Amino acid sequence: MKIIKIGIILLIFAFSLSLLIFSYLYFNGLSGIAQTSTPEPGQIKVACIGDSITYGHGIKNWPKNNYPVLLQELMGDSYHVQSFGVSGRAVHDNSDQPYRALPHYEESIAYDADIIIFMMGSNDTKPENWFGEEAFKTALLDLLDDYTQGEKKPAIYLCTTPACFFMEDSEGELTSHDLRPAYADIIAEIVRQAAEELGYPVIDIHALTTENPQWFVKDGVHPNNEGAAAIAQAVSGAIIQ
């Protein structure tokens, strides 16, 4: 009987610990769980395509404060905003974690959005994911083209990726998560060029965040709640002019 009681106590402890860990991961945008909902008939569908910055890595009270959720609040009930952000993903197909390799990519196509908000490229700054400026631009154009192949031709907004910052004790050219600020600048310029060539509106999140390191969590890479709110405001302002 004593052994059974000890076993029950251990099970309760293990369950409680697991629940605590899960809650921490979930509410800080670290779980990888996607937020999904079904659009109502007549709603304008907005797809937010991106990486961990779109997903909301490190956001406190993540379910209510990641940028696509905040964008939904700003846009109102006439719109349905769906996040297709996945942590660690990159534009280039030869990267360590290409976006096209995910079911989220297929789901973002199937969503048949009226509006695409595309913000990706931070993970392409990693040394192992960088194949040169032309290679990145070609990969970007190819990926964007995937969203124009259906009967519906969505309005596509290109966001430059946010700036990234060195932590106080960092050395060399890499930030945390192995991102390279100098290459983030290069990618931002490539995105601007691509937007001009394609005739897509550009939302310059890179310029918006460059002078605002206080908008980032301690890793210097992921926007905090204030940064997510600033991104949502910029995106909504671009759509509703």
List each model region and its residues.
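N-terminal secretory targeting modules
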Residues: 1-49, 53-62, 72-78, 110-111, ...
